[in-house]
Amino acid sequence: MADNHKVKLEQAQKYVDSIKDEVALSKYRQGYHFMAPASWINDPNGFIQYKGKYHLFYQYNPYDSKWASMHWGHAESEDLIKWNHLPIALAPSEFYDDDDDGGCFSGSAVDDNGVLILMYTGTTNNGEGTVQVQCIATSNDGVNFEKFEGNPVILPNFIEGNRDFRDPKVWKEGDLWYVVIGTTKNNEGRVLLYSSPDLREWEFVSVLAESHGELGSMWECPDFFRVGDKHVLMFSPIGLGTTITMYLIGDMDYSTGKFTWTEKGKVDSGCDFYAPQSLLDDKGRRIIIGWANSWPWMEWFSDFGPNMEDKWNGAMSLPREVKLDEKTGKLKFIPVEEIKNYRKEENKVELRILNGSKDIKISHRNRYEMLFNIDLKSTTAKELIIKLRENKNGVAIIKLDIENKQLIFDRNNCDGYNKGIKSCDLDLFEDTLSVNIFSDN
């Protein structure tokens, strides 16, 4: 088993190494968003701080810029922004994860007394359709992983006939390990909870949460964590229209396995943010990162874009810190502080636009951060429109609709590939000397 896995890893790594220099020359490569050295990536996996460094694993097809035969890519970072690529961590190699239309699906990572353990969904096909099971792999150095001889460690015994049973997210509470796994019943999304004393022998605990017709048909990539004195269940629902990442906030009783949620919300209001995963770092921060791309089943999708011809596809979002807004009871998401260390040249522009427009020239190939301070006290304008990347091929538009209290991003005429118009509400408070604006809480 170990020898076969090693051969598969070496083959995949050899191919990536043979094309990565060519891929690096692609004019579409990003400057400060994480990308694989080449080929296709999607969901973030195994997001963890281990022995002082941040580790990010990810769904990876090393052989093509299209989805297929999932491996786990791997990178590490000191600051969540600049990443160093490490050898591919997992490859399909065993009877439980060798499906050509599957492989080593999404999962998570935990530190078990210095041993880095990955838990992932293995997919195989027994001739009657795809079967999804949960498996583990271990490493003493955080780089080289061996699959557990007793895999799979969780079988789909509680999913009542369907074949969707994937994306384990593991954590420890007290003396027990817990894992949430996404599934569906009667075309309604749900998350199952299991517990274990050793990450190898698991018992079913409960249906942690489920849809009753209002929250989608399948819940992918669930994550369960504490923020403040509340617990959060985060997942990516299928079949919920333009809502592709959401959260439920409530209270957890581990003695009964019962999660009672009272609030729900979107993790992101844009088009390209899917399957986010969280970690808790040594500063006490809950940080998430998501896949910055879309699936063809999403209503705004039209094409993955020209980067596919350059032998790569996909990137991750900027990492965000998760906080609980005590006033609203909802979550707020803030770019991690580390991104400020990459600011180089500051260019302050004071604009007073009565009508028409004002051009702001940006250097560094569209790689910048732009902070706006808008004086709403003095303006009588009904809207403010910001045009990005305007050229002969199109334009992306950000519109602040002051009158209707909305922030709108429109990329329908941006590049000819992915489309979409997304908006979030603005909550504006004015009180003599103060103006406060909250965007989507």
Where are these regions (language model features)?
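Residue-level detector of beta-strand structural context in well-folded domains
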Residues: Y32, N45, G73, G107, ...
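Acidic/polar N-terminal loop/beta-strand segments that form early-domain functional surfaces
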Residues: P37, Y50-G52, F57-N61, S77, ...
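Active-site-proximal structural scaffolding
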Residues: W40, W67-M70, G102, G129, ...
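Hydrophobic core segments of beta-strands in well-ordered, beta-rich domains
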Residues: D43-Y63, W67, P87, F105-G129, ...
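Beta-propeller blade signature
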Residues: H71-D79, V133-G142, L192-D198, T245-S255, ...
